[in-house]
Amino acid sequence: MVYKTKLGEMEISDESIFTFEKGIPGFEHLRKFALVFPQETFPIGWLLSLEDPEVGLPVVDPKLVRADYDPVVPSEDLEEIEAENQEALLFFCVLTIPPGKPEKTTINLRAPIILNQKKKKGIQTILENEDYQLRHLLSEEMERSKTVV
């Protein structure tokens, strides 16, 4: 089906669509989102609202940025997306890219987007891990990851 999104009109397949029962913080009124990876921004993907074409969040797999990323998800959040455990879930972290200053991009490692591919449900959670913050400088995290691997 074709949707109007923040990135323009896009053909989006059903397998890319996820329901967020409580929305996403700041966008609680929106429930349907699609995860897409346009070639021109890969490996950065986009979580696009299918209800408001102005809403789209740049996201990235946190393991690409921080190799030792090991989130502890609250059990009530696993229940909300009908997940038995964390193993089959997809994790993405939201990027904040300041206009004209991509070198100042930050990643939110504390509140990842978690997707249950099987049930097509998603949630943005706040992790119990104390060492993850809402804003980590992307370049510093990638540099740090080189020493961890």
From Swiss-Prot:
One of its GO terms (cellular component) is cytoplasm. Keywords: Bacterial flagellum biogenesis, Chaperone, Cytoplasm, Translation regulation. Pfam families: FliW. GO terms for biological process: bacterial-type flagellum assembly; regulation of translation. Coiled coil: none annotated. Its main location: cytoplasm. It is found in: Cytoplasm. InterPro entries: Flagellar_assembly_factor_FliW, Flagellar_assmbl_FliW_dom_sf. It comes from the Bacteria. PANTHER family: FLAGELLAR ASSEMBLY FACTOR FLIW. Acts as an anti-CsrA protein, binds CsrA and prevents it from repressing translation of its target genes, one of which is flagellin. Binds to flagellin and participates in the assembly of the flagellum. Belongs to the FliW family. Interacts with translational regulator CsrA and flagellin(s). This is Flagellar assembly factor FliW.
